[in-house]
Amino acid sequence: MSETKTNLLDLDRDAMRAFFVELGEKPFRADQVMKWIYHFGCDDFDQMNNVNKVLRERLKAIAEIRAPEVSREQRSSDGTIKWALQVGGQEVETVYIPEEDRATLCVSSQVGCALECKFCSTAQQGFNRNLKVSEIIGQVWRAAKIVGGKRPITNVVMMGMGEPLLNLANVVPAMRLMMDDFGYGISKRRVTISTSGVVPALDMLGDQIDVALAISLHAPNDKLRSEIMPINDKYNIEEFLAGVRRYLGKSNANGGRVTVEYVLLDHINDDMQHAHELAKVLKDTPSKINLIPFNPFPGNPYGKPSNSRIDRFSKVLMEYGFTVIVRKTRGDDIDAACGQLVGEVIDRTKRTMKNRMQQDGISVKMV
């Protein structure tokens, strides 16, 4: 990529209009070009036949449309596709999950992750950097181009590699493009951001954009959560859920409820007492609960619970009146299931990041 060229995938609609106004063009040119990029998957200015030739030539000189390239593709027996995408010498993974009534894309927000959750393969790879807007929306662009068809992607979940709320400055514009009518036109109820509990950033998020929220809870008490999710030492369950309720108060995309993600680790957090504890801790936070049977990966001490343990846990929660879904494992034969995304983090700097988080607090850049 040329350093002197602007990658148009880095610009949401406001930024794109400002770009064209700076060129002396009318703002509607931005809308025209966005339709070519996102509706038609076009990355060649010469094909944009409703843009005059003089402007096309100028755009070729100063701009580009460059999405991450696929370095590897794996297709699961259940239809799931996992792509490893090149992002500046590193790799991130993106997963496409087709179902009868929808097609969901699981998108990464960082190269690696700094939060070190003990049950997640991504966390074991270390942390390198935040992804740029073009590298986030570019995952959607690349997947839509490969899959093809009229509505190749109906849902996007920011549940790939990384903690999205530690990259708000790039994640928010990318999500705007997902929902923009000149982008992918996906409903805000079908764009989901997931967080492990970066509470100050959750408050910022609610002031910036309205999307569906999922939270990675994974334990019903602070002692256990801190053991498996170190971020709990900084923002405990009570603080986290208070932040969630504040977000729900600002949001129309969630129907008043948050999705609680709870990975079931055999004989760690899946006892009946844990289910009762979870119901009690969530009593003031309107929730639907996604139970995720653990997906094993090499070198990890945790196991997947038996079906009977999963059923018992689920039934306890339903007795309290919660909507409970046991997530169907998809793509586990190609390591594309929840918690298995790795990519290739070449430069591991997670210790530096962890130290900085402990010393200075978790820093959040905002748009």
From Swiss-Prot:
Family under the similarity heading: Belongs to the radical SAM superfamily. RlmN family.
Listed EC numbers: 2.1.1.192
Gene designation per UniProt: rlmN
Name recorded for this polypeptide: Dual-specificity RNA methyltransferase RlmN
GO molecular function annotations of the record: 4 iron, 4 sulfur cluster binding; metal ion binding; rRNA (adenine(2503)-C2-)-methyltransferase activity; rRNA binding; tRNA (adenine(37)-C2)-methyltransferase activity; tRNA binding
InterPro entries, per database record: Aldolase_TIM, Methyltransferase_A, RlmN_N, RNA_MTrfase_RlmN, rRNA_lsu_MTrfase_RlmN/Cfr, rSAM
Enzyme class: transferase
Keyword terms: 4Fe-4S, Cytoplasm, Disulfide bond, Iron, Iron-sulfur, Metal-binding, Methyltransferase, rRNA processing, S-adenosyl-L-methionine, Transferase, tRNA processing
Keyword 4Fe-4S in record: yes
Subcellular localization: Cytoplasm
Entry binding sites for S-adenosyl-L-methionine: 162-163, 194, 216-218, 295
Binding, [4Fe-4S] cluster: 113, 117, 120
Residues of the active site: 93, 338
Function in brief: Specifically methylates position 2 of adenine 2503 in 23S rRNA and position 2 of adenine 37 in tRNAs. m2A2503 modification seems to play a crucial role in the proofreading step occurring at the peptidyl transferase center and thus would serve to optimize ribosomal fidelity.
GO terms (BP aspect): rRNA base methylation; tRNA methylation
Main location: cytoplasm
Entry cofactors: [4Fe-4S] cluster
Cysteine disulfide partners in this protein: 106-338
Domain of life: Bacteria
The Radical SAM core domain, residue ranges: 99-333
SUPFAM superfamilies, alphabetized: Radical SAM enzymes
The species this protein was found in: Aeromonas hydrophila subsp. hydrophila (strain ATCC 7966 / DSM 30187 / BCRC 13018 / CCUG 14551 / JCM 1027 / KCTC 2358 / NCIMB 9240 / NCTC 8049)
Misc. comment: Reaction proceeds by a ping-pong mechanism involving intermediate methylation of a conserved cysteine residue.
CC annotations in GO: cytoplasm
Reactions this protein catalyses: adenosine(2503) in 23S rRNA + 2 reduced [2Fe-2S]-[ferredoxin] + 2 S-adenosyl-L-methionine = 2-methyladenosine(2503) in 23S rRNA + 5'-deoxyadenosine + L-methionine + 2 oxidized [2Fe-2S]-[ferredoxin] + S-adenosyl-L-homocysteine; adenosine(37) in tRNA + 2 reduced [2Fe-2S]-[ferredoxin] + 2 S-adenosyl-L-methionine = 2-methyladenosine(37) in tRNA + 5'-deoxyadenosine + L-methionine + 2 oxidized [2Fe-2S]-[ferredoxin] + S-adenosyl-L-homocysteine
